[in-house]
Amino acid sequence: MYCTHLMTLQLVVMAMLWVTPVRAGTECRYGCRLNNMTIIVEREDCHGSITITTCAGLCETTDLNYQSTWLPRSQGVCNFKEWSYEKVYLEGCPSGVEPFFIPVAKSCDCIKCKTDNTDCDRISMATPSCIVNPLEM
Protein backbone atom coordinates (compact mmCIF):
# COMPACT_ATOMS: atom_id res chain seq x y z
CA MET A 1 0.00 0.00 0.00
CA TYR A 2 2.84 2.41 0.89
CA CYS A 3 4.54 1.75 -2.47
CA THR A 4 1.31 2.46 -4.37
CA HIS A 5 0.91 5.86 -2.68
CA LEU A 6 4.58 6.65 -3.26
CA MET A 7 4.30 5.82 -6.97
CA THR A 8 1.13 7.90 -7.26
CA LEU A 9 2.87 10.83 -5.56
CA GLN A 10 5.85 10.50 -7.91
CA LEU A 11 3.53 10.55 -10.94
CA VAL A 12 1.75 13.67 -9.64
CA VAL A 13 5.07 15.45 -9.03
CA MET A 14 6.34 14.49 -12.50
CA ALA A 15 3.11 15.75 -14.09
CA MET A 16 3.43 19.05 -12.23
CA LEU A 17 7.03 19.45 -13.37
CA TRP A 18 5.97 18.96 -16.99
CA VAL A 19 3.11 21.48 -16.79
CA THR A 20 4.89 24.20 -14.79
CA PRO A 21 7.40 25.34 -17.49
CA VAL A 22 4.63 25.51 -20.10
CA ARG A 23 2.46 27.66 -17.85
CA ALA A 24 5.37 29.88 -16.79
CA GLY A 25 6.37 30.35 -20.43
CA THR A 26 3.02 31.86 -21.35
CA GLU A 27 3.14 34.48 -18.58
CA CYS A 28 6.84 35.37 -18.60
CA ARG A 29 7.50 36.23 -22.20
CA TYR A 30 10.34 38.63 -22.76
CA GLY A 31 10.78 37.60 -26.37
CA CYS A 32 10.74 39.85 -29.40
CA ARG A 33 7.26 41.38 -29.82
CA LEU A 34 5.34 44.51 -30.78
CA ASN A 35 5.49 47.21 -28.14
CA ASN A 36 3.91 50.67 -27.84
CA MET A 37 6.41 53.44 -27.16
CA THR A 38 5.85 57.15 -26.61
CA ILE A 39 8.47 59.46 -28.09
CA ILE A 40 8.94 63.23 -28.05
CA VAL A 41 8.95 64.89 -31.47
CA GLU A 42 10.08 68.46 -32.03
CA ARG A 43 10.36 70.87 -34.89
CA GLU A 44 10.68 74.65 -35.06
CA ASP A 45 6.97 75.41 -35.23
CA CYS A 46 5.56 72.72 -32.93
CA HIS A 47 6.36 69.80 -30.67
CA GLY A 48 4.61 67.03 -28.80
CA SER A 49 4.61 63.34 -28.05
CA ILE A 50 3.33 60.47 -30.16
CA THR A 51 2.84 56.79 -29.46
CA ILE A 52 4.23 54.42 -32.05
CA THR A 53 4.39 50.66 -32.40
CA THR A 54 7.93 49.33 -32.39
CA CYS A 55 9.75 46.08 -31.63
CA ALA A 56 11.24 45.27 -28.24
CA GLY A 57 12.34 42.22 -26.34
CA LEU A 58 15.04 39.64 -25.96
CA CYS A 59 16.31 37.23 -28.58
CA GLU A 60 17.90 33.90 -27.82
CA THR A 61 21.55 34.10 -28.75
CA THR A 62 24.82 32.30 -28.32
CA ASP A 63 28.05 34.12 -27.73
CA LEU A 64 31.27 32.15 -27.92
CA ASN A 65 33.89 32.57 -25.24
CA TYR A 66 36.54 32.79 -27.91
CA GLN A 67 36.76 34.52 -31.26
CA SER A 68 37.18 32.37 -34.32
CA THR A 69 37.78 33.25 -37.95
CA TRP A 70 36.05 30.02 -38.99
CA LEU A 71 32.81 30.57 -37.14
CA PRO A 72 30.88 33.67 -38.18
CA ARG A 73 29.47 35.75 -35.35
CA SER A 74 25.80 36.45 -35.63
CA GLN A 75 23.92 38.36 -32.96
CA GLY A 76 20.16 37.99 -33.16
CA VAL A 77 18.34 41.26 -32.51
CA CYS A 78 14.68 42.13 -32.13
CA ASN A 79 13.83 44.18 -35.20
CA PHE A 80 11.03 44.99 -37.61
CA LYS A 81 9.96 42.09 -39.80
CA GLU A 82 7.26 44.09 -41.57
CA TRP A 83 6.80 47.82 -41.28
CA SER A 84 5.36 50.85 -43.03
CA TYR A 85 5.53 54.61 -42.76
CA GLU A 86 2.54 56.31 -41.17
CA LYS A 87 1.63 59.95 -41.42
CA VAL A 88 1.43 61.66 -38.02
CA TYR A 89 0.14 65.17 -37.26
CA LEU A 90 1.03 66.69 -33.92
CA GLU A 91 -1.63 68.44 -31.90
CA GLY A 92 -0.91 72.14 -31.54
CA CYS A 93 0.88 72.50 -34.86
CA PRO A 94 -0.26 75.37 -37.08
CA SER A 95 -2.44 74.37 -40.01
CA GLY A 96 -0.52 73.59 -43.17
CA VAL A 97 2.48 72.13 -41.34
CA GLU A 98 3.85 69.03 -43.04
CA PRO A 99 3.16 65.80 -41.14
CA PHE A 100 5.83 63.53 -39.71
CA PHE A 101 6.38 60.19 -41.44
CA ILE A 102 7.20 57.61 -38.77
CA PRO A 103 8.20 53.97 -39.36
CA VAL A 104 5.69 51.74 -37.57
CA ALA A 105 6.25 48.03 -36.94
CA LYS A 106 3.61 45.61 -38.19
CA SER A 107 5.45 42.48 -37.00
CA CYS A 108 8.73 41.66 -35.26
CA ASP A 109 11.30 38.90 -35.43
CA CYS A 110 14.69 37.95 -34.04
CA ILE A 111 16.92 38.41 -37.05
CA LYS A 112 20.58 38.83 -37.84
CA CYS A 113 21.59 42.40 -37.13
CA LYS A 114 21.45 44.53 -40.30
CA THR A 115 24.03 47.28 -40.13
CA ASP A 116 22.25 49.40 -42.74
CA ASN A 117 19.44 50.30 -40.32
CA THR A 118 20.52 49.07 -36.88
CA ASP A 119 23.39 49.82 -34.51
CA CYS A 120 24.95 46.39 -34.09
CA ASP A 121 28.08 47.33 -32.15
CA ARG A 122 28.85 45.68 -28.87
CA ILE A 123 29.48 47.83 -25.84
CA SER A 124 32.99 47.28 -24.58
CA MET A 125 34.60 48.46 -21.39
CA ALA A 126 37.07 50.47 -23.49
CA THR A 127 34.30 52.36 -25.30
CA PRO A 128 33.73 55.80 -23.81
CA SER A 129 30.05 56.26 -23.15
CA CYS A 130 27.59 57.93 -20.85
CA ILE A 131 26.28 54.60 -19.58
CA VAL A 132 26.52 54.56 -15.81
CA ASN A 133 26.06 51.58 -13.56
CA PRO A 134 23.07 52.48 -11.32
CA LEU A 135 24.84 50.91 -8.34
CA GLU A 136 27.70 53.41 -8.69
CA MET A 137 25.43 56.47 -8.48
UniProtKB/Swiss-Prot annotation:
Keyword Glycoprotein in record: yes
Record's GO cellular component terms: cytoplasm; extracellular space
Secretion signal, residue range per the UniProt entry: 1-24
Keywords of the record: Disulfide bond, Glycoprotein, Hormone, Secreted, Signal
Glycosylation sites: 36
S-S bridge residues: 32-78, 46-93, 55-108, 59-110, 113-120
Annotated CDD domains: GHB_like
Function as written in the Swiss-Prot or TrEMBL entry: Involved in gametogenesis and steroidogenesis.
GO BP term, pick one: G protein-coupled receptor signaling pathway
Protein known as: Gonadotropin subunit beta-1
Quaternary assembly: Heterodimer of an alpha and a beta chain.
Subcellular location: Secreted
Similarity-based family: Belongs to the glycoprotein hormones subunit beta family.
